[in-house]
């Protein structure tokens, strides 16, 4: 009988390299927010991959970048703290973009903070380019990370090679116990997941300045008194400027209603019951650079 393996795997990379989509594909359900906008993951979300002979706990971090605000610095600190604590680092590099200074900077950060941690390079988004481009990117990634790191191409969207990624990550884990019971897919509280789902819906199709400026806080969650099958969820969406409030709400409140409809459908799946979702938008000026407001909003 093979020895049970378990441990923590951190997926890292530049913003928008497919880390959250890959987390969801590996776990088999939605535990991390995905958006076409970079820098949309704010919290370290753990997804859990269960198999008969191993358990992988995935830590999905924000994209590492050179910080411009206090929030950016805190997010980067979160990533570096994570590097030092995990068993394996999965470096995500997309197949459809040339390796650049950002990728090299991240490899330098990994080598400086976690030189002994096993590194696996994961070439993501292979469905977006022809096979010869994938092959060329594999060579370029090999030159970047060196001979000691294993390299795996994957498409989280089509599912191609997802099982291979799981096998490679599991093989690098140490022997250990199952940290979580079978069937548990994340250790994030439901309120955090609900806030992330609302945030994802609110970010869909909006201008570039909004992702960094939007925070969502769940204010109240209560079962409806006269109905067993309905839960009331009240959420606050915080932006930094009045102009951003207008973007979220839309003409005559149309966009906020769309956000509510999309988020409610996802929250109902998460909770397994009908949901009444009440969304309110507030302005918290320059919250990304204000330590007190960052703390109040959960950072």
Swiss-Prot record:
Residues 39-43 are annotated as: G2. The keyword Transit peptide does not apply. One of its GO terms (cellular component) is extracellular region. One of its GO terms (molecular function) is ribosomal small subunit binding. Residues 206-285 form the KH type-2 domain. GTP binds at residues 13-20, 60-64, 124-127. Exhibits GTPase activity. Binds RNA but is probably not involved in ribosome assembly in mycobacteria. Belongs to the TRAFAC class TrmE-Era-EngA-EngB-Septin-like GTPase superfamily. Era GTPase family. This is GTPase Era. It comes from Mycolicibacterium paratuberculosis (strain ATCC BAA-968 / K-10). The gene is era.
């Amino acid at each position: 009988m093979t020895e049970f393996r378990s441990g923590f795997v951190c997926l890292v990379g530049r913003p928008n390299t497919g880390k959250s989509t890959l987390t969801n594909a590996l776990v088999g359900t939605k535990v991390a927010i995905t958006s076409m906008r970079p820098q949309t993951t704010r919290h370290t979300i753990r997804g859990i991959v269960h198999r008969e002979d191993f358990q992988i706990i995935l830590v999905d971090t924000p994209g590492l970048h050179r910080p411009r605000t206090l929030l950016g610095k805190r997010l980067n600190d979160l990533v570096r703290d994570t590097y030092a604590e995990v068993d394996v680092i999965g470096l995500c590099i997309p197949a459809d973009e040339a390796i650049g200074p950002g990728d090299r900077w991240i490899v330098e950060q990994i080598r400086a903070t976690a030189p002994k941690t096993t590194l696996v390079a994961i070439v993501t988004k292979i469905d977006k380019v022809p096979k010869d481009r994938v092959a060329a990117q594999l060579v370029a990634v090999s030159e970047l990370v060196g001979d000691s790191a294993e390299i795996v191409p994957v498409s989280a969207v089509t599912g191609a090679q997802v099982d291979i990624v799981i096998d490679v990550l599991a093989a690098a884990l140490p022997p250990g116990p199952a940290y979580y019971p079978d069937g548990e897919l994340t250790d994030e509280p439901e309120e955090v997941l609900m806030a992330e789902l609302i945030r994802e819906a609110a970010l869909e199709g909006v201008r570039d300045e909004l992702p960094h400026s939007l925070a969502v806080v769940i204010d109240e969650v209560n079962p409806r008194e006269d109905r067993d099958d309905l839960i009331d969820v009240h959420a606050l969406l915080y932006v930094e400027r009045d102009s951003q409030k207008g973007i979220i709400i839309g003409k005559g409140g149309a966009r906020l209603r769309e956000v509510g409809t999309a988020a409610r459908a996802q929250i109902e799946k998460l909770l397994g019951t009908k949901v009444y979702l009440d969304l309110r938008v507030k302005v918290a000026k320059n919250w990304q650079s204000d330590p007190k407001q960052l703390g109040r909003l959960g950072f």
